[in-house]
Swiss-Prot record:
GN (gene name): murG
A single GO molecular function term of this UniProt record: UDP-N-acetyl-D-glucosamine:N-acetylmuramoyl-L-alanyl-D-glutamyl-meso-2,6-diaminopimelyl-D-alanyl-D-alanine-diphosphoundecaprenol 4-beta-N-acetylglucosaminlytransferase activity
EC number: 2.4.1.227
Pathway involvement of the protein, from the record: Cell wall biogenesis; peptidoglycan biosynthesis
Protein name stated in the entry: UDP-N-acetylglucosamine--N-acetylmuramyl-(pentapeptide) pyrophosphoryl-undecaprenol N-acetylglucosamine transferase
Organism (species): Tolumonas auensis (strain DSM 9187 / NBRC 110442 / TA 4)
Length: 355
């Protein structure tokens, strides 16, 4: 008998890509997969592109909005729960999996009303508002990092599912770091870029010799960032708005400078690449700092808060590694050791156990 799951996730790649990893694994096991999302976020296009049917409900976030929207919020939430209720009653899934995003809240409530097991997965080290509320009614609570929720009989640390190309990368031997080789540095500020990385990192790298640089600048920033490198005399650099094959870029790099989204941290560990994390300072509940600390407290990465990052400080750190690349080798080993490479299988197993 074929089983059915509804995955509730959307808004950002940090929610959608782990959900897709689980979806593909369950589909390979013969499951029917449906998706619940919102029509104006990235899941609307990305999920169908992966071959999964998607249903939409109308719901928006409540943070940082005006009084009128907050006053209307109870009515909008009730409407969204009703929409989700009707969709789930029609699909009749055996279990629902909430991976975060606006649709997960109403979807989880509707599933609970219908008596459908609710599995919750929190990718970040600090749980988001939707998941904190859903945790009260969830059948099972899964965590990417320890500390997002208290460990109880309902909760488990399972890690964050990553894309297959990163799992393949994790099977390859770690790089060997040697003095004298050009240090290959990858800068990733997210798909929309990160202004401090675009502005400060070029000044830091201009103070170094024997480097090769690839820099993802974000949409509309490539020309300005490229011009900045050129004005600073850095010639061994390639600047692009967006890197389509991130796993290949990680495999190329000796060192990564990036933000600390949950998916990024999981992919860094799987790849076994030394990273300097510069957490987004205004992330909700400072969750990026806590994500980064899952590696930095093990010595498996370096944390550099944005307010403390200067060109001189970053250049000095990298120069130390150029003199003694054994430090990078040790960080790479600790990073790979921290990876939970079977996270997708763990999530799948927890979902199957509830049927």
């Amino acid at each position: 008998m074929s089983r059915t799951m509804v995955i509730m996730a959307g808004g950002t790649g940090g929610h959608v890509f782990p959900g897709l990893a689980v979806a593909h694994r369950l589909q390979a096991d013969g499951w029917n997969i449906h998706w619940l999302g919102t029509p104006d976020r990235m899941e609307a296009d990305l999920v169908p592109a992966h071959g999964f049917p998607i249903e939409f409900i109308n719901i928006r976030g409540l943070r940082n909005h005006g009084l009128v929207r907050k006053l209307l919020a109870p009515f909008q939430i009730c409407k969204a729960v009703l929409q989700a209720f009707m969709i789930l009653r029609r699909i009749r899934p055996d279990v629902v999996l909430g991976m975060g995003g606006y649709a997960a809240g109403p979807g989880g409530v509707a599933a609970k009303l219908l008596g459908i097991p609710v599995v919750l997965h929190e990718q970040n080290a600090a749980a988001g508002l939707t998941n904190r509320l859903l945790a009260k009614i969830a059948t099972r609570i899964l965590m990417g990092f320890e500390g997002a929720f208290p460990l109880t009989e309902r909760s488990r640390v399972v890690g964050n599912p990553v894309r297959d190309e990163f799992l393949q990368l994790a099977q390859k031997p770690l790089k060997k770091y040697h003095t004298g080789n050009p240090l290959k540095i990858l800068i990733v500020g997210g798909s929309l870029g990160a202004r401090p990385l675009n502005q400060i990192v070029p000044h830091a790298l201009a103070k170094l010799n024997n480097i090769d640089v690839r820099h993802q600048s974000g949409k509309g920033n490539a020309s300005a960032v490229s011009d900045l490198y050129q004005s600073l005399g850095v010639t061994t650099v390639t600047v692009t708005e967006f890197i389509t094959d991130m796993a290949a870029a990680y495999e190329w790099a000796d060192l990564l400078i990036c933000r600390a989204g949950a998916l990024t941290v999981a992919e860094v560990a799987a790849a076994g690449i030394p990273a300097v994390f510069v957490p987004l300072p205004h992330a909700v509940d400072d969750h990026q700092t806590r994500n980064a600390e899952s590696l930095t407290r093990r010595g498996a990465a370096v944390l550099m808060p944005q307010k403390e990052m200067t060109a001189d400080k970053l250049a000095e750190l990298i120069a130390q590694w150029q003199v003694d690349p054994r430090q990078l080798q040790k960080i790479a080993q600790l990073s790979r050791a921290a990876a939970i490479l079977d996270a997708t299988d763990r999530v799948v197993s927890e979902c199957k156990a509830l049927i």
